[in-house]
């Protein structure tokens, strides 16, 4: 799958997945809501309630992973075999088998998420995050061995990708102990966006250069500009996340003014409810006293005795 489609397809998936997660994280930060158990899922009681509770990200991972597996197998015209029939036997298509391993782990991650959210009686967050961490660990190992035969521009492109995957591995490992920390989720989303956009950029650098001329491995300027482009991707994705947060905040404040940050919403509701009840109780007691005052004034002292 070392072609244009093989790089741009996973890149597009990661970009759209990162944008989706950026919206989810922005909403959770704005309303101080839970990232793993958002309140809008429990409050949705309509006919679409079950649809909202479906593991959309899990289904997406399964579908994309399966399609990439089919595409990888179809790219080998002679048939994807593991070893030659000669003596001694030799392994065949090492990079293709590495790609299949990556896509299989992506599909497995989606299946685990679906089972945890929609099959098990009680959701197991540790199982979900563990499957994701396993996939990223294996991805890092495969990428390190994937660039053994690379050099020049291709080596620089994949080295920067390995750097992003390594940082993502550290963040996901930390999330095993702090699954609800907003900062870790924001960094994770940021790294996923960088990983996706850089894969798209890599597809054009390695296979379809915009200039129409291939990049030169012996030209130090080309290698330096690979790093420059990567830094631009970092800045653009940071601005993208900031823009998503700003638009989400503006939308919820202007078009949903009745909504409040979820962290203090229940407290405000209880406080207002108890305060209103206490005020009504005082008014009722005062009205009873006012009604009883004329009756007491009509009773003579003899009657009282």
UniProtKB/Swiss-Prot annotation:
Membrane topology note: Multi-pass membrane protein
GO cellular component: membrane
Ranges annotated as spanning the membrane: 4-24, 54-74, 124-144, 159-179, 187-207, 223-243
Coarse class of the protein's main subcellular location: membrane
Region (Disordered): 285-305
Kinase as UniProt keyword: no
Identification of the protein by name: Transmembrane epididymal protein 1A
Family assignment from sequence similarity: Belongs to the TMEM45 family.
Keywords: Glycoprotein, Membrane, Transmembrane, Transmembrane helix
Glycosylation sites: 32
Compartment(s) of residence: Membrane
Pfam families for this protein: DUF716 (PF04819)
